[in-house]
Amino acid sequence: MRKDYLNSNKDSLSAPEKEIERALRPHVFADFTGQEKIVANLKIFVQAAKERKEPLDHVLLHGPPGLGKTTLAHIIANELGANIRITSGPVLDKPGDLAGLLTNLGPYDVLFIDEIHRLNPIVEEYLYTAMEDFKIDIMLDSGPSARSVQLNLNPFTLIGATTRSGLLTSPLRARFGINTRLAYYDVTLLTQIVKRSSQILNVPIEESAAYELARRSRGTPRIANTLLRRTRDFAQITGSGTITQQIAQMALKALDVDEDGLDEMDNRILSTIIEKFHGGPVGISTIATACSEESETIEEVYEPFLIQEGYLHRTPRGREATPKAYKHLKLAPPQRAGTLFE
């Protein structure tokens, strides 16, 4: 079962958790930590669009969950001084849903579509002319009396976010003038984020404790903030309210987050590949079945970090465990078979 701090679905958070997440979210570029090159470029693009009194070019933000795509979308809207309308790909089931959103946008407003790779193909086609020409064709009636009516739209900026940019169609991808990929964070930046969030939450934290949480956060700010909130609970109930390194280590152990930031499901994936399938290669659907998890969840939430950190290899024949995975699980790697001439 997926841990809540790895949950890529922001909508699954409770109302109080959503309020806390909003409070922790930066609202301007100056408060956003990390992704320096991306932020520097976006500052220039936003300022130039404002000076020309033009809509900002459409923006595609892609990368693993929890790195700040939604936060950047809100910051862009704030910096533009524009309203933002928020939706997601699966919600836009019919062209009429999209038309309703687009026709209600004011001049230079921002439309943010999360999980844009999951757009209905029919809806996506309607989006093309809206993005290029700020027009949309809608069908009135049906059958022999059906007719198409073209509606003019206010100039707007579409911001799309996706964890799986490879699933975007070429025509849709080509219509984004600004295409950026967010990268995992290093421990130094995550430590800064943990300390900033602790100040907002008004919870004292030791430097060593902030570092401890940061280094086990899988390079992901959202996970760092969630671990901070859970550790705050332990500090409140079992300590003096201050998050010490000892409290942090105790909380992380209780949450099954090991020294390398891997949780119970990470270790289950690795041990499944090694113990049930002799280290691989093995297909993702087979791994998902063996681990009682969805293939999409493994691909989007767990696999990117495991590959990034060198625990997994992705090959044409499937996933393979690396020597680092064997070492992490304290297992002996298999001996390579000798060649004919050895």
Curated annotation (Swiss-Prot):
Residues that hold DNA according to the record:
R314, R319
Q: Where is this region: Head domain (RuvB-H)?
A: 259-342
The UniProt record gives the binding positions of Mg(2+) as: T70
Any GO BP annotation? DNA repair
This protein's GO CC annotations = cytoplasm; Holliday junction resolvase complex
A GO MF label? ATP hydrolysis activity
- Which coarse location class applies to the principal site listed for this UniProt protein? cytoplasm
Q: Where is this region: Large ATPase domain (RuvB-L)?
A: 1-185
Positions of region (Small ATPAse domain (RuvB-S)): 186-256
Cellular localization per UniProt: Cytoplasm
EC main group: hydrolase
EC assignment: 3.6.4.-
Keywords on this record?
ATP-binding, Cytoplasm, DNA damage, DNA recombination, DNA repair, DNA-binding, Hydrolase, Nucleotide-binding
Q: Show the SMART domains listed in the entry.
A: AAA
The record, for InterPro entries, names: AAA+_ATPase, AAA_lid_4, DNA_helicase_Holl-junc_RuvB, P-loop_NTPase, RuvB-like_N, RuvB_C, WH-like_DNA-bd_sf, WH_DNA-bd_sf
Question: Which residues of the sequence carry a binding annotation for ATP?
Answer: L24, R25, G66, K69, T70, T71, E132, D133, F134, R175, Y185, R222
Q: Which reaction does it catalyse?
A: ATP + H2O = ADP + phosphate + H(+)
Assembly and oligomerization: Homohexamer. Forms an RuvA(8)-RuvB(12)-Holliday junction (HJ) complex. HJ DNA is sandwiched between 2 RuvA tetramers; dsDNA enters through RuvA and exits via RuvB. An RuvB hexamer assembles on each DNA strand where it exits the tetramer. Each RuvB hexamer is contacted by two RuvA subunits (via domain III) on 2 adjacent RuvB subunits; this complex drives branch migration. In the full resolvosome a probable DNA-RuvA(4)-RuvB(12)-RuvC(2) complex forms which resolves the HJ.
Q: Which family does it belong to?
A: Belongs to the RuvB family.
Domain comment in the entry: Has 3 domains, the large (RuvB-L) and small ATPase (RuvB-S) domains and the C-terminal head (RuvB-H) domain. The head domain binds DNA, while the ATPase domains jointly bind ATP, ADP or are empty depending on the state of the subunit in the translocation cycle. During a single DNA translocation step the structure of each domain remains the same, but their relative positions change.
Under the heading NCBIfam families, the entry gives: PRK00080.1, ruvB
The molecule here is called: Holliday junction branch migration complex subunit RuvB
* Organism per entry: Amoebophilus asiaticus (strain 5a2)
The upper taxonomy is: Bacteria, Pseudomonadati, Bacteroidota, Cytophagia, Cytophagales
